[in-house]
Amino acid sequence: ACLVGSEMCIRDREELKAVQALLPLINRMIYLKTDEEIELMREANQLVGKTLGEVAKHIVPGVSTLQLDKIAEEFIRDNGAVPAFLGYGGFPNSICASVNDQVVHGIPSSKMILKEGDVISVDCGTILNGFVGDSAYTFCVGEVAPEVKKLLKATKDSLYLGIQCAVEGHRLGDISNAIQTYCESQGYSVVRELVGHGIGRKMHEEPEVPNYGRRGCGPLLRNGMCICIEPMINMGSKNVAFEKDGWTVRTKDRKPSAHFEHCIAIRPDGPQILSSFKFLEEVLGENAI
């Protein structure tokens, strides 16, 4: 068998048997992307950024999370892409919309109406030119309590601290430890059950990217690795509960949670952020975190 990127060419039945025996190992492989593939991933991720910017225009009191989902899906399709989340593992919508104590994977609903003082994490993905883009941002709905806004800022800051550690030759645990150390120093807790991930032609590839861990541990960061770093940080306890819908994750103590995510590539000259908050921050202006 010839392994070229993420594609295999099987020549005969004996080779097929050999590959089948290796599948458990292959599924744990970290695929390094070429320069051309990274540029295609950048395009998919930039579209995610533009979609979040479009959604940001409509995050106001009185709007439902289902309305936001429809806006995102229409924008993605109008730009020649496919919503990556829609149908993924049976997920019914194009964005995850997680409000207040919902950590991640909130299912958009006509019954979930945003109100003044809420916060909402919008996680969005696209498939464009055969590659997946994935990014998330936690928005304020109107005026938000100062202590909640502080949580959001700390979570976003921890994302960039993690990205700073995403250097070729370092270890994955350096990223994880930077996020954990900073957030816990601010009095917040790090969710354990949910992690970031590798990304490419599939939304979830190896390696897993925890937001906690030890420096110097984990896979070696190599040129061409593409990963999603996504701190999920709670104001109270780190403990979470999974809702009966099979998707939504909440904080057990019902205190607020925040979630920010960038897709990055490991490069010889340092980490490159493939996704973007620029478009939504242009919409939010002074209200951006």
Please report, for each region that a protein language model flagged, where it lies by residue.
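Generic extreme N-terminus detector
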Residues: D12-R13, K33
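Intrinsically disordered, low-complexity regions of eukaryotic proteins
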Residues: C9, L16-K17, A136, M232
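Intrinsically disordered, low-complexity polyampholyte segments enriched for Lys and acidic residues
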Residues: E14-K17, N27
